[in-house]
Structure formats: C-alpha cells, structure tokens
Amino acid sequence: MAPIKVGINGFGRIGRIVFRNAAQSCEVEVVAVNDPFIEPEYAAYMLKYDSTHGQFNGDIQTVEDGLVVNSRNVKFYNKRNPEEIPWAETGAEYIVESTGVFTTTEKAKAHLKGGAKKVIISAPSADAPMFVMGVNHKSYTTDLEVISNASCTTNCLAPLAKVINDEFTIIEGLMTTIHSYTATQKTVDGPSAKDWRGGRTAAQNIIPSSTGAAKAVGKVIPALNGKLTGMAMRVPTANVSVVDLTCRIEKSATYDEIKKAIKIAAGNELQGILSYTEDEIVSTDLIGNNHSSIFDAKAGISLNDNFVKLVAWYDNEWAYSRRVIDLISYIAGKDGSK
C-alpha cells in the first residue's frame, strides 16, 4: 500500500522531529516542506545534526528544489502564506502545521487552497478539535478538515488521567509540569512584555509559567472538564519533561492498587501510548522514548486512599512528534487514504 503523502509547514523544532519520525515510518512519507526562513542546504544541515537527538539515521542530500532523503525527493518551498504553498504539486494531502503561527481553524484552513486535504496543527488550538491518541482519537469524523494534536503535556497527562478517572473517578486535581526549556525562551535575559519571568535566561533559572495543558484534558475527556488545572515550571534541561498530577479520587484505592491499574492499561488498551516503569530513571534516560506518558511508579506517593500524587515522564519533542505521525496514519485510514 502506498504511503500517506505528508507536507510540513515550518521546519523548526517540532517540524524537524516530525520529519525524523516520518522517516522511520512505512505508513507516511514527507514529500514537501515549507519554510520561508531557510534554504534547502540549511534545512539539510539542521535535519542531519541535532544537539539532543543526535545525527539523522539515513542519507540526506540537497538538490536544486529541495532534499533527497533516503532516496526520496522532498520538495522545498519558501512561501510565507499557507494559501501560496502548492501542496498539490507533490501530492501532499496531510499537512503538519508546525509554525506555531497558524493555529486556528481559519488560518490553518488556508492550506486547503494549495491542494491539501487535511491539516494537523502540532500545537493546541483555540477552536480546532483536539485529539490525543489513545484517549479520544476514535471520535474523529471524516468531515473535519483541520484538527489539533493538542500539546505535548496534554498528550502525557490525558492517558494517565483517563486511567485514573475510569478506574477511580477523579473529583479534582492539580497538575504541575516540570518542563524543559523551549525555543520561545531566552538564552540571556531579554524583553518579554506579556510574561516578565519568561524573559529570564532559560539555562540559569527555574521559571514558573502558565499552561493550558490540564484544562485541555477536559476537552478530550469531557467528564474531566472543570476538574483539572495546572501550571508549569520551566527548568534548565534541553529535553524531557515530567508531569506531577495530584488529585482526589472518589473510589478509595491504595497506591499499589493505582499502580496496578496503570500497569494493566499500559499493557493493553494504551499500549504504545502509556508506559509503566519501576526503574530508577532520570530525565535523560527517556530521550527518544516513543511513549506519550511514562508512569514512574517509584516517584508517586499517596497521603491516604483518596488523595494521591502521580508522576509521569515524557519526551516533549520526540514522543509528541511520534503522535503527530500516528494521528495522521489513523485519520488517513478513516478517510480511506490508505
């Protein structure tokens, strides 16, 4: 069966990691990339060398109009506006919108003018339906033209929250993500008018920040709407983050019973999405881990049988990008494109 033809708009951090994940997949093929700020030679360099994930495992060459990656042609465009990108030239039907700019349905829909069939926003969206693999992906309907893969933190929290709510019913909860720094932060102190603390140097500080990830869980699990909220602590690590979910549960359960429920789910309906470990891991051990959520059984604690703190890790770059590929593969199957 022919692979699903994919285009990527925005060859930044997530765009490149999505490309790397696609290169490992037999179901999808990236046939076109658009980025107005870089040329093919520089794109090839950034794809080949990565300070966090190492060198690209494959062959990359540049040609006049793009790249040749593992003997496959990848057309490169430099258009600023989505409606100007001629996706139809390469047959790209599913577009990963990873600029971080066109995150509303109206803005992302502009890709359809160039021949795209569907758009997957690799960020939370104010109005596009959000899907988290393993949680609510089956609610996708083929009439949707623009969807969101939610955020990396929502992809970690939602599977864990789903298991706890399904088995024990969450009354309310608070989440903190201890999150590696990202491209929006500063290498040295600089101006950040809307978030003064966010303008401080990323490599020297623990920076309290806001996140909509916990509230977004209520959009993918309606039963939890209004029951979760959270915050972020941006920390001086380059990759891998960890979620701390502290919640009250209706059905009394010991910590061992909670661990057992998560372990069962990780080996069954959430296999490949949720992982369970009792190893003495630290963040760098999980660079390149494909799971959306890695439950750390030894890191959690409970105060009593109705109040518990749960800890789950995630590679906020790699695992999230892998879910983008998984989501494309799933919706293409529903659309009849594979």
Curated annotation (Swiss-Prot):
Subcellular location per the Swiss-Prot or TrEMBL entry: Cytoplasm
Cellular component terms (Gene Ontology): cytosol
Positions contributing to D-glyceraldehyde 3-phosphate binding: S151, C152, T153, T182, T211, G212, R234
Site (Activates thiol group during catalysis): H179
Pathway: Carbohydrate degradation; glycolysis; pyruvate from D-glyceraldehyde 3-phosphate: step 1/5
Keyword Cytoplasm: yes
Keyword Zinc-finger: no
A biological process term (GO) from this entry: glucose metabolic process
Enzyme superclass (EC): oxidoreductase
EC number: 1.2.1.12
GO molecular function: glyceraldehyde-3-phosphate dehydrogenase (NAD+) (phosphorylating) activity; NAD binding; NADP binding
Pfam family of the protein (one): Gp_dh_C
Active site: C152
Xref: InterPro entries: GlycerAld/Erythrose_P_DH, GlycerAld_3-P_DH_AS, GlycerAld_3-P_DH_cat, GlycerAld_3-P_DH_NAD(P)-bd, Glyceraldehyde-3-P_DH_1, NAD(P)-bd_dom_sf
UniProt keyword list: Cytoplasm, Glycolysis, NAD, Oxidoreductase
SUPFAM superfamilies: Glyceraldehyde-3-phosphate dehydrogenase-like, C-terminal domain, NAD(P)-binding Rossmann-fold domains
Enzymatic reactions: D-glyceraldehyde 3-phosphate + phosphate + NAD(+) = (2R)-3-phospho-glyceroyl phosphate + NADH + H(+)
Chain residues that bind NAD(+): R13, I14, D35, R80, N316
Assembly description: Homotetramer.
Family from the record: Belongs to the glyceraldehyde-3-phosphate dehydrogenase family.
Name by which UniProt lists this protein: Glyceraldehyde-3-phosphate dehydrogenase
